[in-house]
């Protein structure tokens, strides 16, 4: 078994090499005219400036965390925290860098070579992000597992990797979400409603910040989010297996992730081969093909590693993989088709009915995914105990390379459309980029649903590992009873935290958008000839406002998420902490689903009207839908996504400190 420990990090290094090769392929395509390059450079520079400033804040926070971890839990756990933070930061940075290089090339290919080449470039840009997430997880986590020699006692320090990755993910998701939505809301309200100019119009001072936001929120933020769930699922499975002293089950999550990476690379090749088909068909073919390949190889892997126990474990893996697909499809329904048409129709009677209908859709959309998650939990636990929950989460996330690639494709296509509009590349080019963007909106909605389901399952697996670790350290059972006041107190505290964090992040977007709106209004008023197209806006000022606002307001949610488990655990005991995690999980998952789906439905209702339905642009119905979309933006891209990471941060911090309770 020891000779197998080196395989996962080697697979991860191979995946990084493939990502590098794809990056060089992207660079070979034409970057466009000088005007296109200038716009792309502004987006790239704005994104990288934000990342540098964000990571400088993160460096201070993570350094303090590493020192505290070293003092409380020793060197090995501190090393793991450092590795997790570096890996998560690298995944976000590399994905952002490559996405901002692919956007102008996608727009240029749409103008000169057509939809097929444009799809390939946009997808390649997303693939780099996907492969970096999967590969860095294997290199970091697999490398630590190899370093600790697969020993159950020392391998528990790996839990620190999840804490480091989670902290980076939370700051990236919250900071990126505040940035992107303050820019988006400001640009939309002043540009579309007040000035009456189209989206991505070069006269709008907030348009570059809006395009930068697509990258910092939906590429770097989403990448860190998925990375943290991906690693969290593996860590939880390893931790549960460690309490059983079962080295085979400890190594299995890393082995499954390794074949998941290979399956993802094959899925990327399938998308390339199918690129002559419609974009949505090509992307679905790659996703399904990758999942089928993974499930088949996983069957033989589990049999060879676990013998007669392998079948039940494989069925748990299958349950997680199928559950992830189902949650994505349910999300697609609620953010498209009839629910969206109902919201758009309600706009005929004003913005109030748009808000009411959208909230109703969001609330209804929570029910079926929760039932799917409950089914996964019941089936996987029945098959192979608490370990089944962790391994089901691994099954859902193993093909993260292709899943994240398709999700990151969306912002690249969106940016390409923005560049085409700002550079005046013509109606035909815009039609191609719009068709790619439309598919990107669908994949983004599915990706958000998948991310919520994955985060929920990963968090539950980590909570299960927390319970097993406490029981193991106490030499007996650790049971959380609803009749125990300590557990109930913890549950009420836990369920209140998602509402507090949502309030903080929504308020942050509102405050930042207020600053952005005032700046855009000032420029329209004070720069002569700007609205007529005879002068250039000061886009850098808007980027700076969004950056400063995001960095100032991202710290408080992060501090609350990290400190709450320690305060409850050391103040009220392990029972209250277990209750807090249970309450927090239910609150976070419900809030995340409602906000993501309501926001996505509002967004697509606006786009449905903009296609010419119900009178099209410029009507009162359209204005009402824009209000819904504006409220939905921080729902689906700031507060909703922060719930995924919030519960995982609380769970992994609880698991790390469990030996001290």
Regions found by a protein language model. Give the residues of each.
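Hydrophobic packing and interface segments
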Residues: 1-661
């Amino acid at each position: 078994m020891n000779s197998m420990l080196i395989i996962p990090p080697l697979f991860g290094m191979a995946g990084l090499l493939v990502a590098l090769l794809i990056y060089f392929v992207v660079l070979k395509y034409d970057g466009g005219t000088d005007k296109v390059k200038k716009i792309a450079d502004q987006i790239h520079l704005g994104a990288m400036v934000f990342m540098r400033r964000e990571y400088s804040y993160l460096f201070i926070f993570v350094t303090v965390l590493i020192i505290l971890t070293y003092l409380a839990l020793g060197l090995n756990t501190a090393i793991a925290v450092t590795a997790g933070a570096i890996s998560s930061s690298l995944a976000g940075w590399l994905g952002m860098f490559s996405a901002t290089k692919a956007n102008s090339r996608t727009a240029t290919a749409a103008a000169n070579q057509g939809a097929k080449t444009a799809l390939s470039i946009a997808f390649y840009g997303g693939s780099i992000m996907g492969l970096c997430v999967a590969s860095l997880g294997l290199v970091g986590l697999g490398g630590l597992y190899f370093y600790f020699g697969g020993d159950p006692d020392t391998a528990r320090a790996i839990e620190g990797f999840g804490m480091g990755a989670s902290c980076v993910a939370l700051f990236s998701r919250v900071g990126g979400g505040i940035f992107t939505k303050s820019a988006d809301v400001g640009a939309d309200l002043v540009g579309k409603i007040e000035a009456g100019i189209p989206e991505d119009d070069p006269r709008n001072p907030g348009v570059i910040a809006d395009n930068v936001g697509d990258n910092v929120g939906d590429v770097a933020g989403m990448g860190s989010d998925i990375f943290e769930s991906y690693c969290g699922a593996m860590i939880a499975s390893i931790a549960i297996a460690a309490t059983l002293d079962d080295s085979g089950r400890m190594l299995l999550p890393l082995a499954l992730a390794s074949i998941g990476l290979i399956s993802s690379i094959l899925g990327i090749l399938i998308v390339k081969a199918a690129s002559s088909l419609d974009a949505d068909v090509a992307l679905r073919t790659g996703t399904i093909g990758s999942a089928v390949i993974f499930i088949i190889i996983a069957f033989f892997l589990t049999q060879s590693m676990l013998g007669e126990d392998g079948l039940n474990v494989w069925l748990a893996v299958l349950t997680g993989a199928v559950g992830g697909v189902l949650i994505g499809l349910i999300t697609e329904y609620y953010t498209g088709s009839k629910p969206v048409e109902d919201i758009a129709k309600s706009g005929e009677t004003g913005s109030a009915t748009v808000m009411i209908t959208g909230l109703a859709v969001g609330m209804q959309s929570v029910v079926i995914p929760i039932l799917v998650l409950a089914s996964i939990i019941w089936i996987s636990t029945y098959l192979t105990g608490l370990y089944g929950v962790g391994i089901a989460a691994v099954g859902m996330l193993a093909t993260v390379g292709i899943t994240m690639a398709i999700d990151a494709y969306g912002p690249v296509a969106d940016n390409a459309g923005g560049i085409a509009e700002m550079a005046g590349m013509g109606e035909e080019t815009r039609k191609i980029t719009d068709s790619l963007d439309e598919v990107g909106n669908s994949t983004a909605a599915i990706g958000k649903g998948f991310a919520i389901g994955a985060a929920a399952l990963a968090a539950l697996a980590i909570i299960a590992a927390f319970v097993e670790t406490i029981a193991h350290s106490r030499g007996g059972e650790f049971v959380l009873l609803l009749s125990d006041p300590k557990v109930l107190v913890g549950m009420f505290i836990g369920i209140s935290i998602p509402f507090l964090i949502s309030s903080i992040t929504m308020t942050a977007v509102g405050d930042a958008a207020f600053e952005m709106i005032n700046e855009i209004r000032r420029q329209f008023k004070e720069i002569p000839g700007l609205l007529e197209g005879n002068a250039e806006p000061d886009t850098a000022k808007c980027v700076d406002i969004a950056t400063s606002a995001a960095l100032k307001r991202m710290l408080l949610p992060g501090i609350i998420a990290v400190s709450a488990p320690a305060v409850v655990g050391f103040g009220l005991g392990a029972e209250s902490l277990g209750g807090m995690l249970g309450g927090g999980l239910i609150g976070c998952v419900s809030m995340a689903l409602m906000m993501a789906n309501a926001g996505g439905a509002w967004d697509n209702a606006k786009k449905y009207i903009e296609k010419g339905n119900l009178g099209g642009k410029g009507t009162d119905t359209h204005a009402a839908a824009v209000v819904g979309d504006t409220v939905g933006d921080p729902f689906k891209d700031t507060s909703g996504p922060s719930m995924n990471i919030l519960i995982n941060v609380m769970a992994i911090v609880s698991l790390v400190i469990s030996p001290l309770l």
